[in-house]
């Protein structure tokens, strides 16, 4: 089974780096190869992921299932942050400073908010992701 994702070209991670098919490939292969328990059933049937261009990802499965469309949409690991993470269980991105963006941690995402600060057991403070693709234009 093949699922092809045609990505938008205006999506950026919260640190301003473009989201591309390389991130899709990296995420799916990282989760599959590391046998991350939460994603194991979703990624175990992924045979390969191809990226014919910057905004196209082709995900090949060893089985046929209507769940594959859901199983192919885990695009949450920015390759530029996670590529050197060997032990995902020990990685705490919210505690590590971002390598290029002052005041930001390595907890980088695609959503409308980013972590500003937190206190365990008390609060989490989020702020607007200025790189979010769906912000209203001025």
Q: What are these language model-derived features?
A:
Residues 1-37, 52, 58-60, 68:
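Aromatic- and charge-enriched surface segment that lines or borders ligand/interaction sites
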Residues 21-28, 43-46, 123:
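Extracytoplasmic/secreted envelope proteins and their assembly/folding machinery
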Residues 8, 62, 127-131:
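A bilobed periplasmic-binding-protein/Venus flytrap-type ligand-binding module shared by bacterial periplasmic
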Residues 75-138:
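Gly/Pro-rich hinge or "lid" segments in bacterial periplasmic/extracellular proteins
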Residues 6, 41-93, 117-119:
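Surface-exposed binding/hinge segments that line
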Residues 7-15, 45-47, 101-103, 112-114:
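Second-shell loop/turn segments in exported
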Residues 34-43, 101-108:
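Short, solvent-exposed secondary-structure boundary motifs
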Residues 15, 69-72, 136-138:
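A short, polar/proline- and glycine-enriched secondary-structure boundary/capping micro-motif
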């Amino acid at each position: 089974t093949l699922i092809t994702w045609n990505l938008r070209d205006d999506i950026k991670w919260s640190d301003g780096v473009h989201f591309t098919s390389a991130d899709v490939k990296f995420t799916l292969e990282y989760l599959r190869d590391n046998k991350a328990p939460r994603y194991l059933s979703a990624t175990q049937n992924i045979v390969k992921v191809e990226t014919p261009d910057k905004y196209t990802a082709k995900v090949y499965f060893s089985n046929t299932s209507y769940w594959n469309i859901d199983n192919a949409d885990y695009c949450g690991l920015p390759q530029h942050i996670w590529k050197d993470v060997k032990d995902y269980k020990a990685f705490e991105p919210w505690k590590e400073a971002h390598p290029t963006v002052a005041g930001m941690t390595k907890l980088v995402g695609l959503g409308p908010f980013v972590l500003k600060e937190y206190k365990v057991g008390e609060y989490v403070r989020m702020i607007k992701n200025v790189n979010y693709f769906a912000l209203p234009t001025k």
